[in-house]
Curated annotation (Swiss-Prot):
Tree of life domain: Eukaryota
Job description of the protein: May play a role in the early stages of epithelial differentiation or in apoptosis.
Protein name: Death-associated protein-like 1
Keyword Chloroplast: no
Taxonomic lineage from the root: Eukaryota, Metazoa, Chordata, Craniata, Vertebrata
Keyword Signal among record annotations: no
Gene label: DAPL1
GO molecular function, one term: translation repressor activity
UniProt KW keywords: Apoptosis, Differentiation
Organism: Homo sapiens
Pfam families the UniProt entry points to: DAP
């Protein structure tokens, strides 16, 4: 048990613990410090995104006001003249053929 504590406190080559062998492959251990850094970065990111969201909401409100004014100035008939006409008949898409190729089994 004392050896385990000394192993944890002793400096490692390359600044990381040695790899663990599992299933015939060497797997590196994840460091706990790296996970702590990720959590701190996310909290800072949330604060900046909240500020950005407020700015986006304000710009969307301004755009909505401008669109309402345009809708009042130009009636719906003018907008309908510039829209793409709807087709009278729907296009029928032919079904794709499924080609089954007979191949011998791989043994």
């Amino acid at each position: 048990m004392a050896n385990e504590v000394q192993d944890l406190l002793s400096p490692r080559k390359g600044g990381h613990p040695p790899a663990v062998k599992a299933g015939g492959m060497r797997i590196s251990k994840k460091q706990e410090i790296g996970t702590l850094e990720r959590h701190t970065k996310k909290t800072g990111f949330e604060k900046t995104s909240a500020i950005a969201n407020v700015a986006k909401i304000q710009t969307l409100d301004a755009l909505n006001d401008a669109l309402e004014k345009l809708n009042y100035k130009f009636p719906a008939t003018v907008h309908m003249a510039h829209q793409k006409p709807t087709p009278a008949l729907e296009k029928v898409v032919p079904l794709k053929r499924i080609y089954i190729i007979q191949q011998p089994r791989k043994c």
